[in-house]
A protein has these predicted regions:
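Feature representing long, continuous alpha-helical segments
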Residues: 5, 115-117, 269, 296, ...
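Juxtamembrane boundary at the C-terminal end of a transmembrane helix
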Residues: 308-319
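Final/C-terminal transmembrane alpha-helix of multipass membrane proteins
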Residues: 293-310
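Hydrophobic transmembrane alpha-helical segments of multi-pass transport and channel proteins
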Residues: 255-263, 290-298
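Interfacial loop-to-transmembrane junctions
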Residues: 274-297
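Short helical (or helix-break) motifs at transmembrane helix termini and adjacent helical loops
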Residues: 186-196, 260-273
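Re-entrant/interfacial helical elements at transmembrane boundaries that shape
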Residues: 196-197, 272-275, 298, 303
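Membrane-embedded alpha-helical bundles of polytopic integral membrane proteins
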Residues: 2-212, 216-255
């Protein structure tokens, strides 16, 4: 199993590096879009008993979403050197609302959902917290047509929002995007092995019994070390603000990114646990599905951009 995991991981890492650094951006856009579509399908299948009657609506939101961003993305594809600030200058309300909504969900809502799930409380999207009692979990809200549309919107919003986040990083500086990938990858690997070897204290046993505090510490250390190593090796490719960043800012950025990558992992674990599934799919041998591989990236990428801008390490014209 470990050998299979390693081989699959090496193939995926090679694909990401190839499309991020060496190929034209259109390849990253195309392949990442396919990944997102499969991820949305997996999301729906986790709620299969609730969405079977509405699965034919699967394509509506992606098509509408792509219509909104099609014009500015097409412009960028025709001129790779243009800053993504263009996107926000021409559709400011749409993009700012998308980005800030993503940030609010991952930085505030998702952690609250995880904490309350761990404490066996019922947390719904209207921020009403009550004891579970008759309800199985927050996802019981997904039952019926209204719940299906809630589930439908949330899955598309989180996944396409992540995609847009990665595209912004790519077109501003592909090495900053690779910087993000390396932090999350190293943290995932270190958390897995340190958790298996030293893990004794569970992080959130009701959410994911295999996650431990020792794994979190291992992931944090690896993420911070990777950030410093990446800064050293990519120095000539990163922006001036990144190169001149103080060690404290770099530690903060990498730490927050790792912490919220764990939030993304735990959030998807909640959905899998509610669905009674171990994995979201079977696409990647030894790893599960798309959502199993990008759960950390869904939250980590948002935290990375938000705190990178907040700390003054890069400015994409978002805030």
């Amino acid at each position: 199993m470990l050998k299979t995991r390693i081989i699959t991981a090496l193939i995926l890492v090679s694909l990401v590096i190839l499309t991020t650094i060496f190929l034209e951006p259109v390849w990253f856009l195309f392949i990442s879009s396919l990944f997102v579509l499969v991820g949305i399908w997996e999301w729906f299948k986790l709620f299969s008993s609730r969405v079977d009657g509405y699965i034919h609506y699967f394509w509506i939101f992606p098509v509408v979403f792509m219509c909104f961003i099609g014009q500015p993305i097409s412009f960028v594809l025709s001129n790779y050197s243009i800053s993504t600030v263009y996107l926000f200058e021409h559709s400011p309300v749409f993009y700012v609302v998308i980005y800030l909504s993503l940030a609010f969900f991952w930085l505030v809502i998702a952690p609250l959902m995880i904490i309350n799930y761990q404490k066996k409380l019922f947390f719904n999207p209207y921020l009403v917290i009550t004891d579970l009692k008759g309800k199985r979990s927050w996802s019981d809200l997904m039952i019926g047509p209204e719940g299906t549309w809630m589930n439908f919107f949330l899955g598309n919003f989180l996944l396409w929002g992540m995609w847009l986040n990665l595209v912004i990083l790519l077109f501003n500086n592909p090495y900053i995007l690779l910087f993000l990938f390396l932090i999350i990858w190293s943290a995932d690997i270190a958390a897995y092995f340190s958790g298996k070897k030293y893990g004794k204290h569970t992080l959130a046993d009701n959410v994911s019994p295999s996650k431990t505090w020792e794994g979190v510490i291992g992931g944090l250390i690896a993420g911070i070390l990777t950030a410093f190593l990446a800064l050293h090796f990519f120095r000539e490719f990163l922006g001036v603000d990144m190169i001149q960043a103080s060690p404290i800012k770099l530690i903060l950025l990498s730490s927050v990114t790792v912490i919220y990558s764990i939030v993304g992992d735990l959030f998807i674990s909640i959905i899998k646990r509610d669905a009674g599934k171990k994995d979201t799919g079977i696409l990647f041998p030894g790893h599960g599905g798309i959502l199993d591989r990008i759960d950390s990236l869904m939250a980590g990428s948002v935290a990375f951009m938000f705190w990178g801008i907040f700390l003054g390490l890069f400015d994409f014209g978002l805030l």
